[in-house]
Amino acid sequence: MLPWTLLDTAQIPGGADKLRLMCRGSEFSIMLDDIELMNSRVGGSEAALARLSCGRISARGGARILIGGLGMGFTLRAALALLGEKAQLVVAELVPQVVAWARGPLAGVFGASLADPRVSIEETDVGRLIRSARSTYGAILLDVDNGPEGLTRAENDQLYDLRGLSSARAALRPGGVLAVWSSSPDRNFTQRLSRAGLSVEEFRVRANGSRGARHVVWIATRPE
């Protein structure tokens, strides 16, 4: 078996932690310490995040979508496949080097998705875009950290607490969808979504299609 090779590191803004981009043959991994955050061969649940949310609004021709976290682009590519040519997709990525990796060593993984005219990349905290928006987005897709309880960056808690969820609700258009990915279930988070005035469904999805660990996707809808 081929050994893993370190390609690059990236400082997480506002903290001491560093991401590591690793390569083994044609396989890529982004690591935080000894935790694998994402792998180029395992993206089924991230794609499901887009499928379960964008599938509900795909009939709305000019939908504006906000994706929190670029990762390896599984969610972005799945959303592009579902949405029409008039859709607009804004991807917020906190770590500039992750965007550079997507255009560099991970270009083969991303394909043509970053060059799609529907896509714009914002190198910023997705929470800032959410808090500044009012009835703007048809869907907000969050794949930040490992979910509400898998925090690798303390500031991310502001996305998942009641105040953050209320901000997300305000940023959605009536009938819009907040979709949240998590590596594990969280009953308290489900209850917080409801308290924020959202109608909630919870789905268990496989990490890689029909195989792998079971992850969670919440679909929370703002009433019309």
Model-derived segments and spans:
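N-terminal auxiliary segments of SAM/dcSAM-dependent transferases
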Residues: 1-31
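Short N-terminal helix-initiation segments at or just after the protein's N-terminus
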Residues: 10-13, 32, 161-168
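C-terminal lobe and adjacent flexible extensions of AdoMet/dcAdoMet transferase-like proteins
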Residues: 218-224
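Glycine-centered, phosphate/nucleic-acid-interacting loop/turn motifs that mediate DNA/RNA or nucleotide
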Residues: 176
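The AdoMet/dcAdoMet-binding core of the Class I SAM-like
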Residues: 43, 47-172, 180-183, 191, ...
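Short amphipathic beta-strand/extended segments with alternating polar/hydrophobic composition
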Residues: 36-43
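Short, basic/glycine-rich phosphate-binding loops at helix/coil junctions
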Residues: 26-33, 143-148
